[in-house]
Amino acid sequence: MQKQAELYRGKAKTVYSTENPDLLVLEFRNDTSAGDGARIEQFDRKGMVNNKFNHFIMTKLAEAGIPTQMERLLSDTECLVKKLEMVPVECVVRNRAAGSLVKRLGVEEGMELNPPIFDLFLKNDALHDPMVNSSYCETFGWVSQENLARMKELTYKANDVLKKLFDDAGLILVDFKLEFGLYKGEVVLGDEFSPDGSRLWDKETLDKMDKDRFRQSLGGLIEAYEAVAHRLGVKLD
């Protein structure tokens, strides 16, 4: 399967068409961004690590009965995926307080959240991804209530699967975001799951093993990503 025209260039991935109108090539680049793209740096091996990490996680989720767009790996930095009609709203699950939740509510970072919090954000860099709710989704026609309910169901199911997966690897799944789209009318998990879009802490030390290392200038970004991958059993080389 050969990639053809570039369709979309995001902050860390590029999407290409293929000869099959139902399939796309997703290329993971070495770019890393913070502040809605205001700060961008390149890190060697990052595209490869995130591509293989994402394929590993999507495979685990598919095995648990969650429909995903993943077809197969094509190269170190590319995978073949189904073409989805993307929903412009992302789903976030929070198992512990961190990031914007701490700033917004003034709660202590690391506070356990039981039951986990489910948030929705409009995907819009210019507006800094504002928080929305199901009423906004219905009024503005971003996604039907039926499909939104399915997105929420699948997000919580993914959380159950991934919390155990990371716990077994000595990691706390603090929070993560998922993006969904429609494929022939069915809600399907798209985009990616990687340390770029999740918060992962070491269970013993509470060291941050995700993109917060870049956001907070802690250093050791790729070393942390690779350490997480190795703990999970992701084959990188």
Curated annotation (Swiss-Prot):
One of its GO terms (molecular function) is phosphoribosylaminoimidazolesuccinocarboxamide synthase activity. Pathway: Purine metabolism; IMP biosynthesis via de novo pathway; 5-amino-1-(5-phospho-D-ribosyl)imidazole-4-carboxamide from 5-amino-1-(5-phospho-D-ribosyl)imidazole-4-carboxylate: step 1/2. It is an enzyme of class 6 (ligase). One of its GO terms (biological process) is cobalamin biosynthetic process. Pfam families: SAICAR_synt (PF01259). It catalyses: 5-amino-1-(5-phospho-D-ribosyl)imidazole-4-carboxylate + L-aspartate + ATP = (2S)-2-[5-amino-1-(5-phospho-beta-D-ribosyl)imidazole-4-carboxamido]succinate + ADP + phosphate + 2 H(+). Gene3D superfamilies: ATP-grasp fold, B domain, Phosphorylase Kinase, domain 1. CDD domains: SAICAR_synt_PurC. The keyword tRNA processing does not apply. Its EC number is 6.3.2.6. Transmembrane segments: none annotated. The keyword Transmembrane does not apply. GO terms for cellular component: cytosol. Keywords: ATP-binding, Ligase, Nucleotide-binding, Purine biosynthesis. Belongs to the SAICAR synthetase family. This is Phosphoribosylaminoimidazole-succinocarboxamide synthase.
